[in-house]
């Protein structure tokens, strides 16, 4: 094969006229060049031949480059010696051995690792000086001579003959020379032994000699193919075995990569020539970069291929095949190339059109396999993830292969962008140069032989050693023929510089600087060429080649060349920005660039704009600020897609055919196969997702349920809400939530009928295969889990329900069974009497199921069954299910019965299943429909498995009581569970004895904390109540004393809450208020927890009052739910005879009468005060009782607050200071930078808190902040100030606004406003507990409940019983405790809640959580929305109600709303939009005020000739005919009117430069804006408003009869400034006024453009009118952009959808921007305009500088 053609081609363009510089640039050998040239005579002789050599000399193309064009002497017959010398010289110069080394050698060299250059050191040489050329992309050499003829013209014909004749002799000459030189070389280094020499001959990289010089083989390209192959192979025959192989004619194998390369090149360049064989695989061993040959001008294809080739092509081959680049020889110093890429860490260099498709271009970042992108070329970026993006065509010209014209030709078309995800790291690192400039590190001057500004080198080393080696007089430099042996001299280490020798330090510095600048410019992505370098190899046709030092940009697709280093830095910055944009997934097209996308809205507009590069996204935009917004759009979109949904925005065309929401409102489609669910609220997303999860679980048999119980699969009742689904989680808040979409609604009446029939039939006849959902009556709320309705009557008794419980029949207890309790330990099934509605909390893993009403539960819980098949159900589902099934109370509206929480240790009561076939009792119907008002208690959870959480004193008391009196425990029907969630229901059959016992024992808990002293007991000589009945607190450091039992109980409650309740880790159960303690009080040192109040329910028989009943209002319920987090002392029931009724200590303490408050002594007015120096003596005040605290205050609020300062909710520290570290001069602060280091100060000890202060009084307040954060966290929220990093990916508020995050697992909601906490918490409650979780039940229960109800209501809400409406509970609902994921983790978003923490929370603090607390201004519209009330200005249309609006796309399809305000016409689904839209109208009203009117794009404004009517949202001025689409112009125009008013008031009229004032001889006419006085008879003209004032005062004086200081002459009046003023014609004033009116108050220069006015004077109709129209329309596009967010905002959130509040706020922010009302906004614009006009009118510029409102933007210059 003829492999040399291109060498000849390359040589057709030698650097003309620069023969002298060639030797310096000439490329030499690597290893053998250390031996130098054979003899200087050879070179001299060859130079002497120069005149006779032609350009095309095949055997010495390098020489002709070095020595200038040579004559044809090469063609003349030469003596044998000359031939031999020529061959040897060529070999020495590396002009042989194009053929690659065989694969075995490749492998060996890689293994031996001797002399390859280190990775990252790329040897590169410029065209015209290198020994090597890379032919990896040459055209095929099939017809060697033919191709050569093409490339070289006539010269090739003449050369081919001699070449042929020379070939055979060259091989033998070379072989002889090689053997002798090797022997001499090894002997020189002391290797005399022949075996050692042979071994070294193998190790020393002689193939590197051929590799380094491979391109020189091109010289033989003119030989016939057969001889060429032989001769060239002989050339690298240092290894005898290979020589033998070659002699025998054996073939050497080619490494694989070459084929790959040739294929690609063959396709791209000359795909029609199939025989292409490329020599490029030699590159795998080369140490210098091979260079694409420069083609002759006759070969267009070659030209295209070569013109912009990268110089580092062969390295790419090495890197792609995973080879290392190693040091090039064994010497101790490196020989980096002139282009040293060692430090160019981000550069891999590729031939254009070549390289892995995953690499970005000719120059690529060194980031694994990811290439540095070209300006527009990110081919398929390979993600780290499993999915690999297929390569996509480049946007840029396939740099040189595909564009026949200049390399700068525009790209052929847009590239389908590679997929980029924002949630993954950036794959393309913008690691541009850290170097400051191109000259960094160079040596500028020489002083005493040393550089003055030495680069920063720590050791005393030769700073030049990177490029230049110094040899002292005692060293041999290794260059055999160097004339300076054993004299001090220097050699350049770069073979491309031919190891140039220096003897002068100045020359060294100069040469070092050259290399340094080259390296620096590579760092910046530029190649530097000096006038001595030939850049045409890489950049063909450069006009600066050989003329001056210049820099070529190396980025693919960029053909910029600069001579100034500052331009280089600027241009680099441009690429940096582009790279950053590409990292972000966008592409920038500047005004001069063609984006190549015909359907781009900016195509052909010559404007800078951006394209999104993500697949399938065609978003284009002009404004850079849209980048972040669009990024977040994709982030959300990816998140939705991950969950199986696709969101379509209002402005998008929905891809689903027939969707009613398309182009109407933001909505979602489920994209799972076969599912057509459509919805508008993200709140429906989770429930629908769970629906699919449940189906999946069911279909995969995760629960192990027998098919008879599973019933129909997805095919039956496919779209009915979720009746056919096993709703284990009980989280579906409303039956309609899954079928709300208009496309999927379907009646479930048939199922309801079936269910009713099933229930009606006797249980015995129920078929064994009846489906589970058949057991669920339609009347049950969707939140009641299936387990509630599983009656054993629906199951065949002999067959156990769960396989894992085989052998245990499903049983229920008869009414008369002695073991009425039927309680079971954790994990076993609970069965109850049919008449006893039982509520069993069930948790994620190991708790009993809930049994609804009278339906006994099967012998194991579904949750337990799920737990048994761990891994098959997602932890999130398990957690949610657990949350939903943990009740705190349940209410039966039929009987008014309140079932309250109870806890019980699992080991206390053993299961006593009875034998019975009990049938449902008479109360089944009503109880089946009892509301499942359950709430999850935030116990400490870990991955869905609950850990015992807060327990109470009552639970421990109950525990002991039941140990002491098992019978009582049985009677109480306690359900045990390990989870620590309350669950119990007292039996209605409690005997009177039990009640008496309960009443007797209820008063006992105070004994834990207080000791009673009677009249005869001696307590303390100093006691104020000595010899009276009183109580002393026995808690350490408290010392409180009480004269009443009521105060004692209250104080005990205080300690119970502050000291943390039960011992940590105990699993204890709460119990009903009928419990009593049977053990003596415990020692004060380890007090148990006083009980949470839970009252017995009234019996089912009727409304007979119960001795201790609990009110059933939702208000109380909400508080009860909250109370599950915060155990309380019991409310002492009012009906317990011997105890005075007392409210809970959770209300404001001022309502209570006892003298001693918790931790405080309260003094009434005129009470003697204990402290002699008390400043509040004889006034109502409080004294702190803690330790030595001297705190005194006047209000209970401060007292309570002070209590918190003493008691830390997280541990039992008494003093707040214990939560801080104190440092002083004695104990120095470890933080060296602490501002208080030399003073006493405190550091907060909480993790992550860096609070420090030296003021003691700040400590309690700081702790309160932490407490507040913990309360928020308990409610599922975390607050971040704008100085804090919130750490949420993609959070748009991060370090921009103070904001909140919901920290419930899986919830990403973030918001700014406190009130959103309430609605969002309620959303989670609804998801858990059902839609009606806080509705008032239809009946308020037995009358006997009311006393307690009012009492507790007062206590919980602090309001009167009359305020018992649902509205009074809004405040409470905000506190409803909803599940927070992984509360046991102290790190991250959740704050750990230690066991005692709930107990320590005081209700008076919790009240502060209300978002409507002290700052609540009015009953906000949001609150009314929460109550389901309609806001003013809106109308609601139900699903089947005709709104009679022909343009309404929702009519008769979905429930929707219309805004009824004039000129609005907004229609939306989802009530929460109402709030946002109402706010929008508020903002609009504040903008338009009474002088403007706003018209939406969808409505006609009815103004004649208005161009915006029905097309754009726009504004009309009601004072003139001005209209605009940009809201910012409204304020500017208003200012304009204000200014005109000022001018008119001063008696002047303004004329713009474009308006003819029609005043004869006015020197300002049509020149600049000016003012004429309108006073009758006055002709004064001014150009500034300051002159008006003085002139106006003159007229005022005249009117008052005062003589003017200077009056005009009686003749033609001359104004003060000497200008001509108006004549005194009587009509002059009228004329001016009418002219001003006709000019629209001179809207030309000074104001905003007015409408075209037919009555205006000519000039106005001409230029000014056109300018006005231009000004108006120019803003139209921008305004549409601005207006979009507003409408998008209104549609972006749907019913009770707080996640979309997130989008909403974003959009509303934009909307606010759209409606900027701050007048300052338009001042800069006005001032700029004024300044612009100042060129014409100094006065106008001065006017802008004045305090008076500046002129509004002119029409002509409006953007």
Swiss-Prot record:
Glycyl lysine isopeptide (Lys-Gly) (interchain with G-Cter in SUMO2) cross-link, renumbered residues: 288, 975
Positions with biased composition (Acidic residues): 1674-1723
Record's keyword annotation contains Phosphoprotein: yes
Bias (Basic residues): 687-698
Ranges annotated as C2H2-type zinc finger: 551-575, 610-634, 668-692, 1031-1055, 1300-1324, 1457-1481, 1515-1537, 1571-1595
One Gene Ontology cellular component: intracellular membrane-bounded organelle
Keywords linked to the UniProt accession: Developmental protein, DNA-binding, Isopeptide bond, Metal-binding, Nucleus, Phosphoprotein, Repeat, Transcription, Transcription regulation, Ubl conjugation, Zinc, Zinc-finger
Effect of residue 38 to P: Found in a patient with congenital heart defect; uncertain significance; severe decrease of positive regulation of transcription from TH promoter
Biased amino acid composition, Low complexity: 397-406, 699-712, 736-764, 1655-1673, 1724-1736
Localisation: Nucleus
Coiled coil (residue ranges): none
Function: Transcriptional activator. Involved in vascular assembly and morphogenesis through direct transcriptional regulation of EGFL7.
Comment field (misc): Endothelial cells depleted in CASZ1 by siRNAs display dramatic alterations in adhesion, morphology and sprouting; normal behavior can be rescued by restoration of EGFL7 expression. The defects are in part due to diminished RhoA expression and impaired focal adhesion localization.
Name the UniProt record assigns to this protein: Zinc finger protein castor homolog 1
Species of provenance: Homo sapiens
Gene: CASZ1
């Amino acid at each position: 094969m003829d492999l040399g053609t291109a060498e000849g081609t390359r040589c057709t363009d030698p650097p003309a006229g620069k023969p002298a510089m060639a030797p310096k640039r000439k490329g030499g050998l690597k290893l053998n060049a250390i031996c130098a040239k054979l003899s200087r005579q050879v070179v001299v002789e060859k130079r002497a031949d120069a005149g006779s050599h032609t350009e095309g000399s095949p055997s010495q193309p390098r020489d002709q480059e070095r020595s200038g064009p040579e004559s044809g002497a090469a063609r003349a017959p030469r003596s044998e010696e000359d031939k031999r010398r020529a061959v040897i010289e060529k070999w020495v110069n590396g002009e042989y051995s194009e053929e690659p080394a065989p694969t075995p050698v490749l492998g060996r060299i890689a293994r031996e690792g001797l002399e390859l250059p280190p990775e990252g050191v790329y040897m590169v040489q410029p065209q015209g000086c290198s020994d090597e050329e890379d032919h990896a992309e040459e055209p095929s050499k099939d017809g060697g001579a033919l191709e050569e003829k093409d490339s070289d013209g006539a010269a090739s014909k003449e050369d081919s003959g001699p070449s042929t004749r020379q070939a055979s002799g060259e091989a033998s000459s070379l072989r002889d020379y090689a053997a002798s030189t090797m022997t001499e070389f090894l002997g020189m280094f002391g290797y005399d032994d022949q075996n050692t020499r042979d071994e070294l001959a193998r190790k020393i990289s002689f193939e590197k000699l051929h590799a380094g010089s491979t391109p020189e083989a091109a010289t033989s390209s003119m030989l016939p193919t057969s001889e060429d192959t032989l001769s060239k192979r002989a050339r690298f025959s240092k290894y005898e075995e290979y020589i033998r192989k070659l002699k025998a004619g054996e073939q050497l194998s080619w490494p694989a990569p070459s084929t790959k390369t040739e294929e690609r090149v063959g396709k791209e360049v000359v795909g029609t020539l199939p025989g292409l064989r490329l020599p490029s695989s030699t590159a795998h061993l080369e140490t210098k970069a091979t260079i694409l040959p420069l083609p002759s001008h006759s070969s267009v294809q070659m030209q295209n291929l070569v013109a912009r080739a990268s110089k580092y092509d062969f390295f790419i081959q090495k890197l792609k095949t995973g080879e290392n680049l190693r040091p090039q020889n064994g010497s101790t110093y490196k020989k980096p190339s002139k282009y040293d890429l060692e430090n160019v860490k981000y550069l891999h260099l590729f031939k254009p059109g070549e390289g892995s498709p995953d690499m970005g271009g000719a120059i690529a970042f060194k980031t694994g396999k990811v290439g540095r992108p070209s300006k527009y070329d990110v081919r398929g970026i390979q993600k780290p993830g499993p999915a690999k993006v297929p390569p996509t065509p480049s946007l840029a010209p396939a740099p040189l292969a595909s564009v026949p014209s200049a390399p700068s030709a525009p790209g052929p078309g847009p590239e389908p962008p590679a997929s980029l995800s924002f949630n993954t790291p950036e794959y393309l690192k913008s690691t541009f140069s850290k170097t400051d400039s191109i000259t960094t590190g160079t040596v500028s001057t020489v002083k005493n032989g040393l550089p003055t500004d030495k680069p920063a080198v720590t050791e005393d080393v030769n700073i030049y050693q990177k490029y230049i080696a110094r040899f002292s007089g005692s060293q041999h430099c290794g260059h055999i023929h160097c004339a300076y042996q054993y004299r001090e001299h220097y050699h350049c280490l770069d073979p491309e510089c031919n190891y140039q020798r220096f003897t002068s330090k100045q020359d060294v510095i100069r040469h070092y600087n050259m290399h340094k600048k080259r390296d620096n410019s590579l760092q910046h992505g530029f190649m530097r060429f000096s006038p001595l370098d030939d850049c045409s190899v890489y950049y063909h046709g450069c006009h600066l080649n050989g003329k001056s030092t210049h820099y070529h940009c190396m980025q693919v697709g960029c053909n910029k060349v600069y001579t100034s280093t500052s331009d280089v830095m600027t241009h680099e910055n441009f690429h940096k920005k582009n790279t950053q944009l590409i990292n972000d997934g966008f592409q920038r097209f500047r005004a001069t660039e063609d984006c190549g996308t015909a359907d781009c809205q900016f195509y052909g507009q010559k404007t800078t704009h951006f394209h999104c590069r993500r697949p399938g996204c065609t978003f284009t935009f002009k404004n850079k600020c849209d980048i972040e917004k669009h990024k977040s759009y994709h982030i959300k979109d990816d998140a939705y897609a991950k969950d199986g949904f696709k969101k379509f925005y209002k402005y998008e065309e929905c891809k689903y055919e027939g969707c009613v929401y398309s182009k109407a409102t933001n909505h979602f489609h489920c994209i799972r196969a076969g599912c057509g669910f459509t919805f508008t609220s993200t709140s429906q997303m989770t429930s629908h997702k769970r629906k699919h999860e449940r189906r999946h679980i069911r279909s995969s048999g995760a629960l192990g349920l027998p098919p008879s119980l599973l019933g129909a699969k997805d095919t039956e009742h496919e779209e009915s809400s979720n009746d056919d689904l096993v709703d284990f989680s009980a989280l579906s808040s409303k039956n309609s939530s899954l079928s709300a979409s208009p496309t999927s609604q379907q009646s479930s009446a048939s199922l309801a009928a079936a269910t009713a029939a099933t229930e009606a039939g006797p249980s015995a006849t129920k078929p064994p295969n009846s489906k589970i959902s058949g057991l669920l009556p339609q009347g049950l709320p969707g939140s009641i889990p299936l387990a509630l309705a599983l009656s054993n009557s629906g199951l065949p008794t002999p067959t156990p329900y769960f396989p894992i419980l085989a052998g245990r029949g499903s049983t229920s207890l008869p009414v008369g069974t002695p073991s009425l309790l039927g309680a079971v330990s954790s994990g076993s099934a609970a069965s109850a009497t049919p008449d006893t509605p039982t509520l069993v909390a069930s948790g994620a893993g190991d708790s009993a199921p809930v049994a609804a009403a009278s339906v006994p539960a099967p012998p194991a819980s579904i949750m337990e069954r799920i737990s048994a098949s761990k891994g098959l159900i997602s932890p999130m589902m398990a957690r949610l299910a657990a949350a939903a099934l943990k009740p705190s109370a349940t209410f039966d509206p039929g009987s008014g019965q309140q079932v309250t929480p109870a806890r019980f240790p699992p080991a206390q009561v053993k299961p006593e299943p009875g034998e019975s076939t009990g049938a449902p009792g008479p109360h089944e119907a009503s109880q089946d429909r009892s509301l499942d008002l359950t709430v999850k208690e935030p116990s400490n959870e870990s991955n869905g498995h609950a850990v015992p959480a807060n327990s109470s004193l009552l639970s421990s008391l109950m525990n002991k009581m039941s140990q002491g009196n098992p019978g009582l425990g049985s009677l109480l029907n306690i359900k045990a569970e390990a989870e620590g969630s309350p669950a119990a229901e007292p039996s209605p059959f409690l005997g009177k004895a039990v009640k008496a016992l309960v009443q007797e024992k209820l008063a006992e808990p105070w004994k834990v904390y207080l000791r009673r002293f009677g009249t005869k007991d001696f307590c303390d000589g100093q006691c104020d109540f000595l010899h009276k009945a009183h109580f002393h607190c026995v808690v350490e450091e408290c010392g409180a004393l009480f004269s009443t039992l009521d105060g004692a109980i209250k104080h005990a409650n205080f300690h119970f809450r502050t000291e943390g309740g039960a011992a940590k880790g105990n699993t204890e159960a709460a119990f009903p208020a009928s419990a009593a303690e049977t053990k003596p009080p415990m020692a004060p040192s380890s007090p148990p927890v006083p009980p949470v109040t839970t009252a017995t329910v009234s019996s089912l028989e009727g409304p007979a009052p119960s001795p201790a009943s609990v009110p059933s209002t939702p208000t109380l319920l909400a508080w009860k739910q909250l109370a599950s987090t915060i155990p309380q002392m019991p409310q002492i029931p009012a009906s317990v005879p011997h105890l005075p009724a007392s409210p809970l200590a959770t209300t404001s303490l001022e309502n209570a009468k006892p003298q001693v408050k918790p931790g405080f002594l309260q003094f009434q007015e005129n009470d003697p005060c204990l402290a002699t120096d008390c400043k509040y003596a004889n006034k109502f005040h409080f004294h702190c009782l803690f330790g030595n605290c001297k705190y005194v205050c006047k209000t209970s609020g401060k007292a309570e607050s002070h209590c918190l300062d003493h008691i830390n909710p997280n541990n039992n520290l008494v003093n707040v200071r214990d939560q801080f570290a104190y440092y002083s001069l004695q104990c120095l602060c470890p933080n060296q930078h602490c501002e208080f280091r030399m003073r006493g100060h405190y550091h907060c000890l909480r993790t992550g808190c860096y609070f420090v202060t030296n003021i003691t009084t700040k400590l309690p307040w700081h702790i309160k902040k932490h407490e507040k954060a913990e309360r928020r966290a308990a409610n599922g929220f975390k607050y971040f100030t704008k100085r804090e990093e919130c750490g949420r990916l993609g959070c748009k508020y991060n370090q921009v606004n103070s904001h909140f995050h919901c920290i419930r697992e899986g919830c990403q909601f973030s918001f700014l406003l406190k009130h959103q906490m309430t609605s969002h918490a309620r959303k989670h409650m609804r998801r858990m507990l059902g839609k009606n979780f806080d509705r008032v039940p239809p009946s308020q229960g037995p009358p006997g409940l009311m006393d307690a109800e009012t009492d507790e209501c007062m206590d919980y809400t602090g309001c009167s019983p009359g305020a018992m409406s649902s509205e009074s509970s809004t405040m409470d609902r905000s506190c409803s405790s909803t599940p927070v994921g992984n509360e046991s983790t102290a790190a991250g978003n959740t704050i750990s809640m230690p066991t005692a923490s709930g107990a320590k929370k005081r209700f008076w603090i919790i009240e502060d959580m209300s978002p409507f607390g002290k700052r609540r201004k009015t009953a906000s519209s949001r609150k009314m929305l929460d109550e389901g009330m309609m806001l003013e200005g809106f109308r609601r249309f139900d699903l089947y109600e005709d709104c009679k609006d022909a343009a309404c796309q929702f009519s008769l399809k979905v429930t929707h709303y219309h805004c009824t305000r004039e000129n609005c016409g907004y229609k939306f689904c989802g009530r929460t939009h109402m709030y946002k839209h109402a706010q929008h109208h508020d903002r609009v009203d504040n903008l338009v005020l009474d002088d403007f009117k706003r018209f939406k794009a969808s409505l006609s404004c009815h103004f004649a000739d208005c161009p915006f009517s029905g097309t754009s949202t726009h504004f009309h001025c009601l004072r003139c005919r001005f209209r605009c689409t940009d809201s910012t112009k409204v304020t500017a125009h208003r200012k304009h009117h204000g200014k005109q008013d000022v001018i008119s008031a001063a008696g002047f009229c303004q004329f713009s430069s474009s308006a003819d004032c029609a005043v004869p001889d006015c020197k300002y006419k049509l020149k600049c804006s000016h003012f004429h006085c309108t006073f009758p008879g006055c002709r004064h003209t001014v150009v500034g408003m300051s002159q008006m004032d003085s002139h106006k005062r003159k007229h005022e004086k005249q009117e008052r009869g005062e003589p003017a200081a200077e009056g005009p002459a009686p003749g033609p009046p001359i104004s003060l400034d000497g200008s001509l003023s108006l004549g005194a014609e009587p009509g002059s004033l009228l004329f001016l006024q009418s002219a001003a009116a006709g000019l629209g108050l001179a809207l030309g220069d000074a104001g905003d453009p007015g409408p075209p006015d037919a009555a205006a004077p000519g000039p106005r109709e001409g230029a000014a009118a056109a300018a006005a129209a231009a000004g108006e329309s120019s803003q139209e596009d921008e305004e549409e952009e601005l207006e979009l967010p507003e409408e998008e905002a209104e549609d972006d959130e749907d019913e009770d959808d707080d996640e979309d509040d997130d989008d909403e706020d974003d959009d509303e922010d934009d909307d606010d921007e759209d409606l900027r009302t701050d007048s300052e906004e338009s001042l800069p614009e006005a001032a700029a305009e004024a300044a612009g006009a100042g060129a014409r009118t100094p006065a106008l510029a001065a006017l802008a500088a004045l305090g008076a409102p500046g002129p509004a933007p002119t029409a002509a210059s409006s953007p």
